[in-house]
Amino acid sequence: MQQTPAKLVLENGSVYTGYAFGHIGETGGEVVFNTALTGYQEIVTDPSYAGQMVVMTYPLIGNYGVNQSDAESQKIWASALIVREMSNIHSNFAATGSLDQYLKEAKVMGLAGIDTRKLVREIRQKGAMRGVISAIDPDEKRLEEKALKIPEMTGLDLVKKVSTSQTYTIDCDDAEYHVVAYDYGIKQNILRMLQNAKCKVTVLNANTPIEEALKLDPDGIFLSNGPGDPFAVTYAIDNIKKLAEHNTQQKPVPLFGICLGHQLMSLAFGAKTYKLKFGHHGSNHPVKNLKSSSIEITSQNHGFAVAMESLPESLEMTHLNLYDQTVEGVRHKKLPCFSVQYHPEAAPGPHDSHYLFEQFTAMMDQAKENV
């Protein structure tokens, strides 16, 4: 197979030369790495990766192809996929095509044949950086200048880019609960997990006023994952503040947040967030449940975190990351509100934290009993 030469140039001038697959062109974004061994299709279709180019640390990617059921959204959101070796052969009974063709049809670039271990070490040491991949412009200095012009992730609201434009409902035949989900970049497996928990789910645009959500008479409200800087999503923070005020004055509506939703809920109650050096991206992060002292292996995908020292008196930390001692979960001491930084629905990843969806339904049951 003929290979098209391509380069990745980082904002600090580092150059990685390989070959392009998927779409042949030029693209840019923040370069981050993911330590999952499998799940590349779920990763590139996760809206949380909007504006980012993902480096897979596992050396061989594409060997089991792609299929529609593994997609976490309707399109590829990652700006590019960077791998050590791209498999030209896929073997999987469920595969409907190759990763190369999948990226090509979506006009998304891939870069292979580079030293991904060296690249990941550089990101770990220096932090996530902006970069440009090009198969059409060989001028490294010009590509470096293009990388420097890419907006930094700090201060960037990408939720507006990925959120649904229309309200839609996912029915459940044996539904016992009605959940309103704010779509900041929601993954399909989250919706499946809510369905499995016997929830009918109404999905709203991220900018929908909380008053409109409450008119739907939900049993609970869910705050989804999503991309970008949580501090920039001011309309979502204001919505959660209004919901908290509603919950103190009227019948409380339970609230559950995941990833960006966790950060937004924490900000609404007075905590602060900050950008991690290179983020948490992978399916093997150990998290300690501070109540049970059990250890959960979790799937994570976030570049920002809640500052532990900023947690207000009203919030209690419930989960702790054992890699870097960062906040992985909080709950409100008086209101029926809780959130986690990681992805209990996984996809890809372990299932250690599925119990959190049961915790959400138990909270909704209790709210019904207290009416």
UniProtKB/Swiss-Prot annotation:
Which GO terms label this protein's molecular function in UniProt?
A: ATP binding; carbamoyl-phosphate synthase (glutamine-hydrolyzing) activity; glutaminase activity
What the entry lists under SMART domains is as follows: CPSase_sm_chain (SM01097)
What's its top-level EC category? ligase
Provide the Glutamine amidotransferase type-1 domain boundaries. 178-370
The protein's annotated catalytic reaction(s) are: hydrogencarbonate + L-glutamine + 2 ATP + H2O = carbamoyl phosphate + L-glutamate + 2 ADP + phosphate + 2 H(+)
Name the GO terms of the biological process aspect: 'de novo' pyrimidine nucleobase biosynthetic process; 'de novo' UMP biosynthetic process; glutamine metabolic process; L-arginine biosynthetic process
- What is one Pfam family matched by this protein? GATase
Binding of L-glutamine occurs at S48, G226, G228, L260, Q263, N301, G303, F304
Pathway given for this chain reads: Amino-acid biosynthesis; L-arginine biosynthesis; carbamoyl phosphate from bicarbonate: step 1/1; Pyrimidine metabolism; UMP biosynthesis via de novo pathway; (S)-dihydroorotate from bicarbonate: step 1/3
Question: What is the annotated quaternary arrangement, including any partners?
Answer: Composed of two chains; the small (or glutamine) chain promotes the hydrolysis of glutamine to ammonia, which is used by the large (or ammonia) chain to synthesize carbamoyl phosphate. Tetramer of heterodimers (alpha,beta)4.
Q: What is this protein called?
A: Carbamoyl phosphate synthase small chain
Species of the source = Prosthecochloris aestuarii (strain DSM 271 / SK 413)
